[in-house]
Amino acid sequence: MTLFFKRHGLIFVLAFLVGSLIVFPNIFAVNRLGSDFKGIFPAFNDDEFHYLGMIREAYDGHYSLGNVFSGEHKDAPSLTQPLAPIIFAFFAKVFNLSIPATMAINDFISPFAGVLLLYLLLFGLFESRVIAGSFSVLYYLFFISLFSRPVNPQFSFLFFYLGLFFIWKIISDKEITLRRLALFNFGLAVVFGIVFYIYPFVWTSILAVYGLALLFLVLKEKRAIFYLKGLLFFAAPVALAAIPYVLNLKRVIADPNYLDTFLRFGFILNHYPSALLNVALIMSGLAIIYFVSRGADFKQKIFVYSLALAGVALNWQNVITGKILSFSPHYYTTIVLFLFIIFAFCISMVWKNYKENLLSARNYLAVILMAILLVFVFNHTGKQNLIGYKAFWLMKPGDIAELRDPQKLSGLVDWFDKNSPKDSVVYSFGNDCDWLIPTYTYNNLYFHCSNGLFLASDDELENKWVIQNFFTEAIDKKYIENSSMNIWDSKFIERYQNEAVRNKILSFLKIKKDIPASVLVPEEYIDRVLQKVDFYQKMGFEKALKQYTVNYILLYANNDEYSDQAAKLRTYSFLKLVADIEDNLVFEVVK
């Protein structure tokens, strides 16, 4: 053990520093606020409150995550992977912590573990502490802001590194026996079975890499039966692990809202190539492999070629299947990870050739291309992540209102926890509390922009959006188009973006002239929402509001846009003012 830490101790120090950098904004914010800190943590990343809301939902006992933010459909089958929220909810309960506090602590733990596991993978591949340590730390620094996002990729990528590590062990073991092969396959199955219920962009990547690596290994060694026997120790446990998923899927398909929801997830029929940036990057990685792979260990070549080809397959599988995965840009972090492993392979081979006086022009080309790609990825990703790393603006002296103002909402959280029934529904407007209610209380929102990610009909989502915007003036076609993601999620944006890609390809190849401009939201949907606006305005606020479950109305009285609403709400006989906390008015809806 002493020898181990003597050889690899530095990576623990570097992992500690990376974890500290990522958790630092939270520590700094809490310390800067001092006695003014009331338990409301700042957010440093997109989608942070989405994941915190999922964890809070599991914390409150709704383990299926049927609908995280709405009062309806709580017992619906899950469309999102529930395992990570359940794990973090468990730890929050065990240590009696709030969900944001739990995840703030995890801002250190997961990146710390991630750097170590990525180092384990790279050291296993190239047996160089310098190469493994450098690229492990560099990868996290390039995504320093992104790795502060809870669950994905912060937590899920831990299993990504482990999955790739087991794949490498399967193909690289020089004294492989059936017993060892079975052991590594079983280890991979355990990792795969866990991440299968955490993040699809990780398990699909693991599956693609393993399938290609195994294919290449069988073709090279001509030992198909041997490796197929080992594969059984992967396939059988995975099949067992998938049983709950299959049972849940049967419930999903049987749900009357399935078709609307399926289309909102962006699974559309399109055979045109997309994700062009991802593919361009990984194709450049293929070129680097080609330039430096002469004389390399054939199993290393199998592994890195599998990474590169898996990257192409994951992004362009729709050319064959026609199915485009919703949010395909989420594979970008995967592509960059594959690139960094290829870069490590490049450096290890160039160093090997340098020591043996075998450097060639191809090696120099590989290094130049790698440098160009590093600069590009930093400019495209790392630079944005550093800007997003809020410690920089937190460190500026002077006004810290951005940190202090949310603390005023702690009284609101305390009031709801003490006075509202569990799973109450809050109609919130004028105070931008969509993030607060689902994260810090056990209550739900009347409308939330993420409701489209759960089983619900388009009709219900449109109705709730219209009622939520009852007091919004001048709702027109442009306003609805700009709100399309809030209403229908990815139903139209994915099709719109893919049509734009297709039109660019057709125009570039001059295959088709006079290509009509892509339409974001079809006219019939615009007209339908406008009709609902008129319908609910004529119905009146009380009847419109009570179309769906609602218990409270929350209004921030100092919002200029809603300055006259406080007086108006006081006039409604079905509303009773029950709290006034820092100008946040809470009205109880009388049935």
How would you name each of these model-derived features?
Residues 47, 72-73, 191-327:
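Transmembrane catalytic cores of multi-pass membrane glycosyltransferases
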Residues 55, 370-457:
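Extracytoplasmic
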Residues 1-32, 182, 368:
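Start-transfer (signal-anchor) and selected internal transmembrane alpha helices
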Residues 20-159, 200-204, 391-403:
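Active-site lumenal/periplasmic loops and adjacent helix-entry segments of GT-C-fold
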Residues 232-239, 350-387:
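Signature aromatic-anchored transmembrane alpha helix within multi-pass, membrane-resident enzymes
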Residues 166-193, 228-229:
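Short hydrophobic alpha-helices at membrane interfaces in multi-pass membrane enzymes
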Residues 444-552:
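Luminal/periplasmic acceptor-recognition loop/helix of membrane-associated glycosyltransferases
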Residues 204-205, 324-355:
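Hydrophobic/aromatic-rich transmembrane helices and adjacent perimembrane loops
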